[in-house]
C-alpha cells in the first residue's frame, strides 16, 4: 500500500478521534455507525449512479465511506473492536463495493449503452468480491492471501474519481469513467492472480485437505 495512503489514513485517524469520542458520548456504537454508513452509501450508489448522476453519486458515496471509517476510531477509543464487529465491517464493505459497481453497470448498460464499459464494470464487480474472499478463505485455512497491486482503498479512489470527473459540473470528462474502469478491471484481475499465487506458495498450502488421521476435514467454505 502506498505511503501516500498510509499518511492520509494516519491523518484521518488523528482528525477523527474527537468525532469518535463525541459519537460514543452520544450513545452510538461502532456497529451502528458501520450499518448506517453502509446503508447510506448503498442507497446513494443505487439511486444516483443508475440515473447518470455520477458526480453527486461519487460525492455521496465518498462522504459515507469516510463516515464508515469512523467505526474503527470509535472501536479504538473503546480499547479495541470485537470479532463480530470485524466480520460486520468486512461484510458491509462488500455490500458497499457491490452497490457502487452495480449502479455503474446499470448506467453503462441502459444510460450509455456501452457494452465495453459494461464488461469493465462487471469485471470490477466480480473481482472486488473474489479478491476479498481469497484473503478471508486463505486466512481461515491458516494461509497467506493478502497483497496485490490494488486493494480496497485504491479501488474506491479510482472508481469514484473516474465517475465523478466524468460528470463534473460545467466541464464533464466522459472518457474518465471508461479509463478508470478498464484500468481498475485489469489491475483487479492482476491482484486476483497475485493473491492466488500467494496462497499457492504459502507454507502448508499443498498439504492434503483430508487428514489421514481421521480428523474432520475442512469444508470448501469459510
From Swiss-Prot:
Binding site for Mg(2+) 2: 68, 89, 93
Co-factor requirement: Mg(2+)
Pathway assigned in UniProt: Phospholipid metabolism; phosphatidylinositol phosphate biosynthesis
Protein function: Catalyzes the conjugation of the 1'-hydroxyl group of D-myo-inositol-3-phosphate (also named L-myo-inositol-1-phosphate) with a lipid tail of cytidine diphosphate diacylglycerol (CDP-DAG), forming phosphatidylinositol phosphate (PIP) and CMP. PIP is a precursor of phosphatidylinositol (PI) which is an essential lipid for mycobacteria required for formation of their cell wall. Is essential to the survival of M.smegmatis.
Organism expressing this protein natively: Mycolicibacterium smegmatis (strain ATCC 700084 / mc(2)155)
Complex and partners: Homodimer.
Membrane topology: Multi-pass membrane protein
Reaction catalysed by this enzyme: a CDP-1,2-diacyl-sn-glycerol + 1D-myo-inositol 3-phosphate = a 1,2-diacyl-sn-glycero-3-phospho-(1D-myo-inositol-3-phosphate) + CMP + H(+); 1,2-di-(9Z-octadecenoyl)-sn-glycero-3-cytidine-5'-diphosphate + 1D-myo-inositol 3-phosphate = 1,2-di-(9Z-octadecenoyl)-sn-glycero-3-phospho-(1D-myo-inositol-3-phosphate) + CMP + H(+); 1,2-dihexadecanoyl-sn-glycero-3-CDP + 1D-myo-inositol 3-phosphate = 1,2-dihexadecanoyl-sn-glycero-3-phospho-(1D-myo-inositol-3-phosphate) + CMP + H(+)
Catalytic residues (positions): 93
Family classification: Belongs to the CDP-alcohol phosphatidyltransferase class-I family.
InterPro entries: CDP-OH_P_trans, CDP-OH_PTrfase_TM_dom, CDP_ALCOHOL_P_TRANSF_CS, PIP_synthase_PgsA1
Keywords: Cell membrane, Cell wall, Lipid biosynthesis, Lipid metabolism, Magnesium, Membrane, Metal-binding, Phospholipid biosynthesis, Phospholipid metabolism, Secreted, Transferase, Transmembrane, Transmembrane helix
Main location: membrane
Activity regulation details: Competitively inhibited by several inositol 1-phosphate analogs, including the phosphonate analog 1-deoxy-1-phosphonomethyl-myo-inositol (Ino-C-P). This leads to inhibition of M.smegmatis growth.
Residues spanning the membrane: 32-49, 55-74, 95-112, 118-136, 156-173, 179-196
Cellular compartments annotated: Cell membrane; Secreted, Cell wall
Pfam families, sorted: CDP-OH_P_transf
EC class: transferase
EC code(s) of this entry: 2.7.8.-
A cellular component annotation (GO) from this entry: plasma membrane
Residues annotated as binding Mg(2+) 1: 68, 71, 89
Name recorded for this polypeptide: Phosphatidylinositol phosphate synthase
Biological process, per Gene Ontology: phospholipid biosynthetic process
Disruption phenotype: Allelic exchange at the pgsA chromosomal locus is achievable only when a rescue copy of the pgsA gene is provided to the bacterium, demonstrating gene essentiality.
Top-level taxon of origin: Bacteria
